[in-house]
Amino acid sequence: MGKRIVILGGGESGVGAAILAKQKGYEVFVSDESSLKDNYRSDLQNAGIEFEEGRQNETRILNAEEVMKSPGIPEKNEMVKKIRAKGIEIISEIELAYRFKGDSKIVAITGSNGKTTTTALMYHICRKAGLDCALVGNIGYSFARQIAENPKPLYIAEISSFQLDDIKTFKPDIAILTNITEDHLDRYDYNFENYIRSKFRIAENQQPGDHFIYCADDEITMKYINRYNIHSNQLPISMKTELSNGAFIKDGDMYVRTGEDFTSMSVYDFALKGKHNQYNTMAACVAGSTMDIRKEKIREAVQDFQGLEHRMEPVATIRGVEFINDSKATNVNSTWYALESMTKPTILILGGVDKGNDYSLIEELVKEKVKAIICLGADNRKIHEAFGNIVNTIVNTDNALDAVQASFHFSTKGDVVLLSPACASFDLFKNYEDRGNQFKKAVKEL
C-alpha cells in the first residue's frame, strides 16, 4: 500500500482530497467527528474509501504518516493538538492538490474582502478568452477533486487563509491579495499578525517568473509587504497613485500596464459598480494582462460580467423600498464597503456570530446613512453598545422573516433595506447562503 493519509473532516475539501489521494495510491481514511452529508457519504462509499463519522478513532488517526486537515478545523481542536504533538505532518487540501497538478497553471486569489468577486471575474475573463479552465477552492469544486475527476490546464482558485495555513510547496503562477482587514481573529488567537502572515503565504513559494498582484492603497498590506521575502514580479493596483507597473485609476479611467502591455478603459464601462469593485476589476485585469489575454476580450468580460449571489445583490423594490442582499458580508470591512456605496437612507440588518468585530470602523457611515438597525443574531449586545447613542431605532430579531418585516415597518418610500450583517451566520443559519436565501424568501413574501 501507499502512504497512510488521514483526512480530518468529510466536507467538500475532505472528500475531494480523499478521492484524489485514493486515486494516487494512498491508503486513505476519512474521520469526521460530526455526521456526514448524504452526498459526501455516498461519494466516499462509491470510491471505496474507509471513513468514520460522529466519532474519532484516535489510534488510527495517530498512526497516519500524513494528515490532511479540512480548513474548517481550528488548531485548538484536541485531535489536531495530538497530531502536532506526535510530529505527524499536517497539510491542507490545496497542498495535496498542488502535488498532482502536473503542468497546469494556477491563478490563486486571497484577501479579507473581494476575493470571491475577483475570482469569479477572473474565471469569466479566462472563459471569454477561450481558455479551458476550472473554478476551484472556496468557490466551486474542491481543488483536489477537480484534479482527480476533470483536470484542466488552468485553475482559478479562491483561497482562504485557513487553506494557506498548512501549505508546504503550493505555488500559484499568479497570486492576488485583494486586501487585509481584521477577520477570523477567533481562529488566530486574536492576534492580527498571525492572520496577516497567513495571507502573505500565498506568495511565499513564488519565483521571479511568477506574478504577485496586491493593493497599494491597502494600509495593512503596505505596512507588512517588506517583512516577507517576495521573489515574484510585484504588480500593485491603486486609485491614489499613478503606477508604472500594475494598474491605477485616474479621472474615471483605468490604466493597466504589465511589461510592454498597456490597456485603458473607462470605469463607467465596468459591470461591477462601487469603489471596492473597481479594485476587484483592476486586479483581475492585471492578471489577465500577464496571461497575454487580448485586450478586447478583457474589456468585453469586464463589461458583461454578472455579479454574484449574496454580494450586493438587488432582490426587489416593494412600494418604493429597495431590498439588497449582501449576506456574504461576514466582517465589518465588507459592511463598510456596502454602506459606503449607499446613496439613500438605509435600514441596516446587522448581526450574527461576532468574530472579534470593531464596529467603530463603520461608526461614521452609520451616523451618516443609517436610520434604523435591525439586529439578526442570537446575541446583539455589542451592536447595541456600539450604536445605541447614534441610531434611535435598534430592534432585535432572531429570524429572517421578522428582520425583513421589521425593516419594512421602519422604512418609507425611497429607503434601502440592506442585509449586510458584518458577522458569520451559524448562530441562526446553516451558512451565509442560507441567510441570504431566507432573506430573499421573506422579501418576496411581503
Feature-to-residue mapping (PLM):
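C-terminal helical cap/extension that packs against the catalytic core
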Residues: 41-42, 360-415
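Short internal beta-strands
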Residues: 27-33, 212-216, 349-350, 369-378
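Phosphate-binding loop of NTP-binding sites
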Residues: 4, 22-23, 58-62, 71-216, ...
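N-terminal leader/targeting and accessory segments in enzymes
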Residues: 1-92, 96, 385
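Residues in the short beta-alpha loop(s) of Rossmann-like NAD(P)-binding domains
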Residues: 11, 34, 139, 217-218, ...
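Nucleotide phosphate-binding/pyrophosphate-handling subdomain across enzymes
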Residues: 4, 14-24, 264-371
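Residue-level signal for inorganic ion chemistry
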Residues: 21, 67, 109, 138, ...
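Beta-strand->loop->alpha-helix junctions that form or flank phosphate-binding loops
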Residues: 52-55, 93-96, 228-249, 301-303, ...
